[in-house]
Amino acid sequence: MSYYAFEGLIPVVHPTAFVHPSAVLIGDVIVGAGVYIGPLASLRGDYGRLIVQAGANIQDGCIMHGYTDTDTIVGENGHIGHGAILHGCVIGRDALVGMNSVIMDGAVIGEESIVAAMSFVKAGFHGEKRQLLMGTPARAVRSVSDDELHWKRLNTKEYQDLVGRCHASLHETQPLRQMEENRPRLQGTTDVTPKR
């Protein structure tokens, strides 16, 4: 793993969390229980504090950063999609930030909210609970339905389960030269399917 102390501050990672070896954690970073940090994620706590609360996931290629004297927070069971950028913001409990979205300084995403993929949330935005946000700049278009929240929670559970799966079986290896006969397919732990 790539952990770096910065000006005397060392990242804190709960023993039940999984941090991919290619992720980078610098300085004032706090990672809670059962958190998943994906490949190539960058959590750069060299100005403000970065906090990833229990059960949350920060997926591949995400960036977290913030300003001095601020906390950038992903709340409990937060779900941060591939390539998202979080800068000096707060993501509420059980919220989802879609792939390649950008959440700017001082923005607050409400609990159980969903930010659609490729959205841009402006600095200082203050959302409410259970909003569907989308666009550039993002705006609330409606409330998150019970079905959508259930779908979000199933996806988050997949990542929570992936933590244990990675601890048990992920390791560096050499590639095969050809595909083996009857190669098995990997399965998830829930019945979640892509939202259409």
From Swiss-Prot:
UniProt pathway: Amine and polyamine metabolism; carnitine metabolism
InterPro entries found in the cross-reference section: CaiE (IPR023446), Hexapep (IPR001451), Transf_Hexapept/Carb_Anhydrase (IPR050484), Trimer_LpxA-like_sf (IPR011004)
UniProt xrefs under CDD domains: LbH_paaY_like (cd04745)
Keywords, ordered alphabetically: Repeat, Transferase
Biased composition (Polar residues): 187-196
GO MF annotations, alphabetized: transferase activity
Single Gene Ontology BP annotation: carnitine metabolic process
Protein origin, superkingdom: Bacteria
Start and end residues of each stretch annotated as Disordered: 173-196
Family from the record: Belongs to the transferase hexapeptide repeat family.
Known role: Overproduction of CaiE stimulates the activity of CaiB and CaiD.
The protein's name: Carnitine operon protein CaiE
